[in-house]
């Protein structure tokens, strides 16, 4: 699901697992600012705003990942299942958790050719 009140930029060859959410809106914490208000002409408005999301090429976001507005995920990243991404993730990183944190860099040693159990 993409809630795109602000631009969402997705690079080439990005894989999304089921139930991923990209949410650009940011809501105020105080209910006085979050509740709907009305202008003199009767038009409704609120103080919601949004921040863009950028996902670099060749990323994989596993199942149930949530990406919050204002975040950039660098190229070649893997984001673990159930992660909530609240801050930028540098390129070629394995990251997971709630909140999502970088676990380590993805390197040549992660190549499938080194997984002897598969051959």
Residue spans for each PLM region:
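Flexible, glycine/small-residue-enriched loop-and-beta-strand segment within the central core
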Residues: 1-71, 98, 106-107, 112
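C-terminal/domain-terminus segments
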Residues: 63-100, 112
């Amino acid at each position: 699901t993409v809630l795109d009140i602000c631009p969402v930029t997705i690079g080439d060859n990005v894989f999304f697992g089921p139930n991923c959410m990209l949410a650009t809106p940011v809501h105020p914490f105080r209910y006085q600012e979050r509740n709907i208000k009305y202008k003199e002409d009767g038009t409704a408005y609120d103080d919601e705003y949004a921040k863009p999301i950028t996902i670099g090429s060749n990323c994989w976001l596993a199942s149930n990942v949530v990406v919050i507005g204002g975040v950039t995920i660098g190229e070649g990243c893997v984001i673990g299942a159930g992660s909530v991404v609240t801050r930028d993730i540098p390129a070629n990183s394995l990251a997971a958790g709630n909140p999502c944190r970088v676990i380590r860099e993805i390197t040549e040693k992660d190549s499938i050719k080194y997984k002897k159990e598969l051959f």
